[in-house]
């Protein structure tokens, strides 16, 4: 698999998703992914830090450009704990846990991202506070998003060989048939 192509596909996907999601600075963006799936293998069987770099670098660039916080989900071996910047942990009141991700407990994407963060901390969960997210390889990130999740259909549905699912969230609409709502 060509790493430049993976990076290009990731850049296209993240830019399109962030344009559609229209997040405010300081919002939490959730990333979950499997480099094994990107390579066409079963999740957890062919991790690659090189593939992780090709995915994480363009995502971090897009996230930083918009003033967002990135939360990177780990694998089931660390109970799907997430990597965030310490500033995001403090802002959102998240519970820190003690684990350092590596390729076989956390996964390649989280491991590479951990090395790139300025002040990385691991948190147990996001308390359902994520504003939008990207799932690369069907690793299931929905548990970290706010209650009203809106699927986002992108022009591309794969990165490498991995199926992707993108989502944004919106506030709950309350009040019934006589209520009026802001256009979202």
Curated annotation (Swiss-Prot):
The record, for SUPFAM superfamilies, names:
TTHA0583/YokD-like
InterPro entries, alphabetically?
Answer: Antibiotic_NAT-like (IPR028345), DUF436 (IPR006340)
Superkingdom of origin: Bacteria
Q: Name one Pfam family in it.
A: DUF436
Which HAMAP family does this UniProt record tie to the protein? UPF0340
Q: Which family does it belong to?
A: Belongs to the UPF0340 family.
The molecule here is called: UPF0340 protein TTE0860
Taxonomic classification: Bacteria, Bacillati, Bacillota, Clostridia, Thermoanaerobacterales
